[in-house]
Amino acid sequence: MAPRILYVVTEDWYFLSHRLPMARAAEAAGYEVHVAARLKDGRAGIEKEGFTPHALH
């Protein structure tokens, strides 16, 4: 089982614009990447990267 990392940000777009390079590096290092955020238009981008989204309400 791969280690997991959880990014917690307020908005999905913020993750994609500011944390994506770090998340890609974590995945390349063998981590399973999860993202907790308010999910709107950026959800598809998070899923396209192969990361697991979690909705914050």
Regions found by a protein language model. Give the residues of each.
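N-terminal subdomain of nucleotide-sugar transferases
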Residues: M1-R38
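Conserved nucleotide-sugar phosphate-binding/catalytic loop shared by glycosyltransferases and other
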Residues: A28, V33-H57
